[in-house]
Regions:
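Short strand->helix junction
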Residues: 69-72, 143, 147
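Terminal catalytic/cofactor-binding subdomain
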Residues: 1-129, 134-136
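Loop-rich catalytic cores of soluble enzymes, especially ATP-dependent carboxylate-amine ligases
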Residues: 115, 144-170
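An acidic/histidine-cluster motif and surrounding catalytic segment
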Residues: 140
């Protein structure tokens, strides 16, 4: 617990990080396709994407991360550049990317978990919840200095979680 507290104590208020999750789609059928490893490997040759690209549980999904921005505008600038590069990379490899919330017809049973220790552990521990997690979304992380302050902010947000969920489910 001490190490978690140290991380929060070293944080900077109101820094922002953005993560976008994209479905990897076959260009002809628009069905999910298991091409994460290929895209991730190709991204290693790009100095921006090498740091920005990450896996997110299933092989038909790819994520880009802005890194820590000093403010929202800074994070958006970084994310836009990485997104443009990732879309170009996907087009060069003959796949489409989409942020669809969930995929409308690709069966969750056909999705494969990325083969790493971490994701094998997630699949083992969460099973059905992990298997059904075929979602593609955007996350915004906001830095709050101090563990106690971060908990206090979460406590204050709890009464409006329903409204935040409604806004995010558009």
């Amino acid at each position: 617990m001490a190490s978690v507290r140290e991380v929060f104590d070293a944080s900077t208020d109101f820094t922002v990080g953005i993560e976008e999750e994209f479905a990897i789609l076959d260009p002809d059928t628009h069905a999910l396709t298991h091409r994460f490893a290929e895209l991730s490997e190709a991204a290693e040759a790009d100095p921006v994407l090498a740091d920005a690209v990450a896996g997110e549980l299933i092989q038909s999904e790819i994520e880009i991360r802005s890194g820590r921005g000093e403010d929202f505008a800074d994070a958006v600038r970084g994310q836009r550049g990485a997104r443009a590069r990732l879309l170009r990379l996907a087009a060069e490899r003959g796949v489409l990317l989409a942020t669809t919330g969930t995929h409308p017809w690709s069966p969750w049973q056909e999705q494969r978990v990325i083969d790493t220790d971490h994701y094998r552990r997630v699949e083992r521990d969460l099973q059905y919840l992990a298997w059904r997690n075929n979602t593609f979304s955007l996350h915004v992380h906001v830095g709050i200095r101090g563990a106690d302050r971060a908990i206090a902010v979460c406590d204050r947000l709890r009464p409006v979680l329903s409204e935040l969920l409604a806004l995010s489910a558009n």
